[in-house]
Amino acid sequence: MRSAQVYRWQIPMDAGVVLRDRRLKTRDGLYVCLREGEREGWGEISPLPGFSQETWEEAQSVLLAWVNNWLAGDCELPQMTSVAFGVSCALAELADTLPQAANYRAAPLCNGDPDDLILKLADMPGEKVAKVKVGLYEAVRDGMVVNLLLEAIPDLHLRLDANRAWTPLKGQQFAKYVNPDYRHRIAFLEEPCKTRDDSRAFARETGIAIAWDESLREPDFAFVAEEGVRAVVIKPTLTGSLEKVREQVQAAHALGLTAVISSSIESSLGLTQLARIAAWLTPDTIPGLDTLDLMQAQQVRRWPGSTLPVVEVDALERLL
């Protein structure tokens, strides 16, 4: 006997979270809980404003239609990426095919003061990996901050993300302020320039390795080994079903590329599932999941070690 619930939720964000020049005041999304006999599975559907093609209202409509079809015996996944991902997670939990083991190590995210990151990394055991958003300020400032961090922590490897913010000139201005002796400790820089060709040129000219992120979701993208390209950053909420996520990871690994499972600012429930996906598909790579502290609460499932208050399922708005 099948049953299902759908919940709508909204979490207040910390002040200062900006996506594509828009301030994100709340994170809005949906949960689906599928039950069959004694088993149950959960999934999160939370399109990311400015990045997802769909709004959460559109996702809600598709999700409710899919749930009704599933209750009637149909299991075909929806095409909408955020819904496909959330539903496939719920089905995987229901079938016990999403392993419980999780990689809760997250590359800490530096959003502002580099001194805060230095203090956080001082207590980090093992491999020191952190992420810095660049492209939000002047390229020269970004270069100086990155250089400072690499100089201050000799065993640090940085992941940088420019979100295609730079022109070729700005990319060169950034690189000018990063000591060439430190550049090999930039694990990769995600999408430095507005076009892939400009990003490739940046990698050739600076010796700084790059990673594809937004490019993975463009219709003309193909997985190929290229000089200067070291990694792909996979955001499952923006990718689609678990099967599609696994296909992309396998395609990257076949070319010797690093695949990084990365957050689209999901709630704690979604983040714990991403940690399990990372442990399953990319066990040797620290995932990019350090986004929970951008929010003011956890929901339903706790992230280990987080002190944020937890909103239980009974407090959510039930749609079905």
From Swiss-Prot:
Alphabetically sorted, this entry's keywords are: Lyase, Magnesium, Menaquinone biosynthesis, Metal-binding
Top-level EC class: lyase
| Binding-site positions, Mg(2+) | 161, 190, 213
InterPro entries attached to this UniProt entry: Enolase-like_C_sf (IPR036849), Enolase-like_N (IPR029017), Enolase_C-like (IPR029065), Mandelate_racemase_C (IPR013342), OSB_synthase_MenC1 (IPR010196), OSBS_N (IPR041338)
Task: Write out the catalysed reaction.
Answer: (1R,6R)-6-hydroxy-2-succinyl-cyclohexa-2,4-diene-1-carboxylate = 2-succinylbenzoate + H2O
Listed EC numbers = 4.2.1.113
Q: Which residues carry out catalysis?
A: 133, 235
Biological processes annotated in GO: menaquinone biosynthetic process
Its biological function? Converts 2-succinyl-6-hydroxy-2,4-cyclohexadiene-1-carboxylate (SHCHC) to 2-succinylbenzoate (OSB).
Pfam families noted in UniProt = MenC_N, MR_MLE_C
Molecular function in Gene Ontology: magnesium ion binding; O-succinylbenzoate synthase activity
Question: Which NCBIfam families does this UniProt record tie to the protein?
Answer: menC_gam_Gplu, PRK05105.1
Family recorded in the similarity comment: Belongs to the mandelate racemase/muconate lactonizing enzyme family. MenC type 1 subfamily.
Q: Identify the metabolic or biological route this protein is part of.
A: Quinol/quinone metabolism; 1,4-dihydroxy-2-naphthoate biosynthesis; 1,4-dihydroxy-2-naphthoate from chorismate: step 4/7; Quinol/quinone metabolism; menaquinone biosynthesis
Extract the PANTHER family matched here: O-SUCCINYLBENZOATE SYNTHASE (PTHR48073:SF2), O-SUCCINYLBENZOATE SYNTHASE-RELATED (PTHR48073)
Which protein, by its recorded name, is this?
A: o-succinylbenzoate synthase
Q: Which cofactor(s) are needed, names only?
A: a divalent metal cation
Gene3D superfamilies from the UniProt entry: Enolase-like C-terminal domain, Enolase-like, N-terminal domain
